[in-house]
Amino acid sequence: MFKFLRRLIGAIIVLAVIIVAGGFAWVRVVSHDRVYEATEAPYRDVALVLGAGLTPDGTPSTYLSGRLDEAVTLYNAGLVSVILVSGDNRTTSYSEPDAMAGYLVEKGIPREDVIADYAGLDTYDSCYRARDIFGVTSVTVIGQSYHIARAVTTCQMLGLDTVGVGNEQPHATSTWRWGIVRELGSNVKLIADLIQRREATIMGSQETSVTDALARHGR
């Protein structure tokens, strides 16, 4: 009995390693040649900035402000026309999208070119809603560099013409290292979400805010 259990546990461990390693390799194959520095990215209609938390005073976290700065670079270089900020709005006093929009406006981005998605609860939901709620077809997704391969893969597999920009700062922190480890499980979850064809957690009516903004740019 003990020998059987030991073999069973060993088989489970081997299977888990294969699944995790397979997920890691798969997202890198899909995202290959689709990740760029902001100044070198090809044009896409929309920059999709993924939420990354707020400080206690309600301003974007260090990670989030880094992502937003990448969006500013893309917009000012004419590499995107609209910025879609997608994050958590769990309570009336916690709104990542509002904080993100305010940050961008302070950086000189016209408010009419900043669109807020208040139900981007995770990367999958943000990409899904960008497509089905906001009508986005062409996107530069922005996150930290340790998870940009998965972000690009998520949007690409959901049918968006996707490239990605990964912010590198701050790099040498325990949060960054934990993020790298967490990605291993997140890759597997993405595969499960795609197989199950999961909808975004929160859907709602279609919006024309992105397409209206693009129309003002002649897109």
Give residue spans per PLM region.
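Compositionally biased, low-complexity repeat tracts
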Residues: 6, 18-19, 83, 160, ...
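A transmembrane-helix-recognition feature enriched in membrane-embedded lipid enzymes
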Residues: 177-199
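N-terminal type II signal-anchor transmembrane helix
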Residues: 1-39
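A structural signal for short, hydrophobic/glycine-enriched beta-strand patches
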Residues: 26-180
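A general structural signal for short secondary-structure boundary/capping elements
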Residues: 90-96, 163-166, 185-193, 208-214
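Short linear elements at protein peripheries
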Residues: 198-219
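Extended hydrophobic leader/signal-anchor segments used for secretion and membrane insertion
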Residues: 11, 41-43, 188
